[in-house]
Amino acid sequence: MKILVIDNVNYEDYPTGGILNFYRNMLPAFGSDLLLAGITTDDRTPVGIWTHREIDGQEFEYFSMAKVTPSAKRPLIPERITNCFYIKKYIRRILTHNDFDWIVTHKPEVMYFIPDGFMSKTCYIMPGVENPLSISRYPWARKLAGVYDRFFLMPKAAKARKLLAAADLNDRKAFAERSKGKISVDKVIEFPTRYDDSIYGVKRISHDDNEKIFVTVGRLGWFKGWKLMIDALKQTREKVNNARLYFIGDGEDYDKIKDYVHEQGLDDSVNLLGKMAPKEIAVWLNKADVFVMGSMAEGWSTTLVEACACGVPCVVTDFSSAREMVADGKNGFVVSGRDERDFSHKMVEALGLNRDKVIEYDKKFERLAVSHLREDMEKILN
């Protein structure tokens, strides 16, 4: 089976996030059976033609749609809009390489420009089923969420051969309802995020007993709930005075977070560690006493899956799939609402969970290892 992947990533390290992680997992799983169309962040890869590119020691046929300069800052023009320009420009040229059985993408703007004649071999994978404009970094864009659903997303998604979603049943039902009859819930197949089991797993790492380590991983954006986690840490330190919160990741809110931490008098208790390689993240997850996530919305969170793979207790907000992964009192807690006192209470309670029992419970998620990815995708696509 040959798969053409089209997305605005470079399949190596930019932009960071769950979508890139998914493709990173696809590379070793499918190898040379993948054709890659994406972006480039280097000066070596030509734009606008099919060529060959080496990624992690493996050579792939590659089509770069744009040369992009990496930045953690919010661009003046939303990436979804700039994506549309170069996807529209090159989509037909990409499709001239017709040696593929399936087209796979996570991006609705890619799917929108795929000609209808190719939709019968298109698989659209949704990292979450919420309307992406509803959680946009741009306030004006959130006002267009309804228009986006009605005229942009749903009509095209209804034509896709396969719809996969990293979301639980309730959210998949909500997505089907939003389609106004265009898409049935049965067509939206649950497909959880995967973790790289060659990197993420249980490793006993000792740390200073005088410190209780809370770790969160993800983009530094408002929708990831950084304020909730910082406020909750401040509450937690009233009971656990050696509690510290470590942010792993980069993003447009870096300076805002630094300023807010200073305003709250938490300079010695909150650390922004920046972007890290997966192996470094795995070390921190194993070192952590508790993993925390304050997201306003998620699909099947990659970092939550990775945290469970490392056997660390998790305290998370009630986003899609949270209750699929976290069982209260077993391997962590799911917190309804966005009250920092409730979140803090569960952070403290999670410190008391038996780590060995958490590790034993989390073994049930070994089925989400990337070593099963190809087999699981082929069952759906064949």
Regions found by a protein language model. Give the residues of each.
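Active-site proximal beta-strand in glycosyltransferases
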Residues: I3, W102-V104, P115-S136, L164
